[in-house]
Amino acid sequence: MLNHPSQGSDDAQDEKQGDFPVIEEEKTQAVTLKDSYVSDDVANSTERYNLSPSPEDEDFEGPTEEEMQTLRHVGGKIPMRCWLIAIVELSERFSYYGLSAPFQNYMEYGPNDSPKGVLSLNSQGATGLSYFFQFWCYVTPVFGGYVADTFWGKYNTICCGTAIYIAGIFILFITSIPSVGNRDSAIGGFIAAIILIGIATGMIKANLSVLIADQLPKRKPSIKVLKSGERVIVDSNITLQNVFMFFYFMINVGSLSLMATTELEYHKGFWAAYLLPFCFFWIAVVTLIFGKKQYIQRPIGDKVIAKSFKVCWILTKNKFDFNAAKPSVHPEKNYPWNDKFVDEIKRALAACKVFIFYPIYWTQYGTMISSFITQASMMELHGIPNDFLQAFDSIALIIFIPIFEKFVYPFIRRYTPLKPITKIFFGFMFGSFAMTWAAVLQSFVYKAGPWYNEPLGHNTPNHVHVCWQIPAYVLISFSEIFASITGLEYAYSKAPASMKSFIMSIFLLTNAFGSAIGCALSPVTVDPKFTWLFTGLAVACFISGCLFWLCFRKYNDTEEEMNAMDYEEEDEFDLNPISAPKANDIEILEPMESLRSTTKY
């Protein structure tokens, strides 16, 4: 979304005539697009776009209000450059999950324990440090989002993050080699590595999901007649939903690396488990470098974060009266923004309020990479590494994301709109069901011999098969489809154009708060308290979901109104990078209700 200033008729007329500075490159006319809060330095830089009309615009037919309510909504097409960005995400998540999957064993156990480890921090210490790593990885996106939106831009921030990431993985790999050092050096290397990886993750995570969504022009809904003769509405909001489903699908393809790294940990050692992600991460580096000219890189805001905080301060002093911050209402104040910016801040604040209950959701989600692994170590593994079963969450997502996107969501949309608030509520409920299953399973573990309530104090497990954990992972995957994917979509779609990375980082910050709650709960991650841990999380997630629905269901009624703000400027332009020919755009399906094409998805 590119916002144009409403600063009088003269300026508006200039914009209509296309009075922009022209840049020659490869015999293609390009222009620099500026909004009311983009600096001149940035606007005259390399942010160039092809403003040739889109082929679809020539036959544009807008729907009536009745058609908006009655016709089926479908998505548009996804450009090839989105696939390149998705490959970067896949590579980064391959490395992240491949590294973090063995962390619990690496921290909790010693070299002579079963399962083997390195740092000997016991269950409480390992769980606490695991939650710290999650906390750190989701605090740093605030820094990454601020830097990207204010100084460097998304692409440059991502590139800087990849360099730091490589350094962190290399330190972890070197210090995990048994012949290189002892336990003390391993602890030092581990701490240094997770700090660097956390910083890098923040710089990448706050911007990559925004960058992939930036590749989609925001267009008004239009009528399309399918080959079957059915009239449907091509809705860019559905396209955005499809992109984030696809993006999350690629995350989980990458997360399957834990299947390889846990096996390497079990059979070769931790050094081998960390070498694989180090090597694989270079795919992200290569894709970023060679795909640079393909990406749309939007202008960097001119101190837009600082201006947004000034608006919020004015709102606080005036009891959140948004008119108090509008230049049209108070021209004597000479505010360095326009009314449109204030309206976008209002929408962004509404989105941030929706995120208030997410820390509880992320707390239950975090048990999957900490307490679930410890629970598995109490059970009969039958040759399976205790940290291997995390893969079933990713496998379930890879299976069910296309099913939801191709069948479930289109089926529901035939009869009623499925709005974001409703989907997030369902996500909380499935999270509660997952913790309920884990609590019941834990009670059976404690009732089984030979060790009953104290299986962690022995090297042999209780007689319960570890595969009983799989339903909990599947339920968590359902909760992610509804709550996590929709949260990403909501954070992007409700953020002002030049604050999208920062608002996305606020959403990711809720994960950090969830990890902080998990750290506070680490003292109860001991025998025989795990049953109460899972029960408490189930109740908390259920209550939070109900409160979420009661507080925010009204936003479902204003969803279309909030989304309409995005159409006001971008519908005039086709935002394709100069170097990306139209032939690179691929039609996934007609209608685009599935993201699967020539690849697995």
From Swiss-Prot:
Chief localization: membrane
Residues the record lists as Phosphoserine modifications: S39, S45, S594
UniProt GO BP: dipeptide import across plasma membrane; dipeptide transport; peptide transport; protein transport; tripeptide transport
Region of interest (Disordered), ranges: 1-66
Pfam families, A to Z: PTR2
InterPro entries (alphabetical): MFS_trans_sf, POT_fam, PTR2_symporter_CS
Bias (Basic and acidic residues): 14-28
Extracellular side: 1-150, 203-210, 288-294, 400-412, 467-494, 548-554
GO cellular component: cell periphery; fungal-type vacuole; plasma membrane
Record's bilayer topology term: Multi-pass membrane protein
Phosphotyrosine modifications at: Y37
Transmembrane segments: 151-172, 183-202, 211-229, 268-287, 295-316, 379-399, 413-429, 449-466, 495-513, 527-547, 555-577
The UniProt record lists the keyword Membrane: yes
Keyword Transport found: yes
Keyword set, alphabetical order: Membrane, Peptide transport, Phosphoprotein, Protein transport, Transmembrane, Transmembrane helix, Transport
Superkingdom: Eukaryota
Compositionally skewed regions (Acidic residues) per UniProt: 55-66
Comp. bias regions, Polar residues: 1-10, 42-53
SUPFAM superfamilies, A to Z: MFS general substrate transporter
Molecular function as annotated in GO: dipeptide transmembrane transporter activity; peptide transmembrane transporter activity; tripeptide transmembrane transporter activity
UniProt topological domain (Cytoplasmic) ranges: 173-182, 230-267, 317-378, 430-448, 514-526, 578-601
Function per UniProt: Uptake of small peptides.
Family designation: Belongs to the major facilitator superfamily. Proton-dependent oligopeptide transporter (POT/PTR) (TC 2.A.17) family.
Protein name per the record: Peptide transporter PTR2
Source organism (scientific name): Saccharomyces cerevisiae (strain ATCC 204508 / S288c)
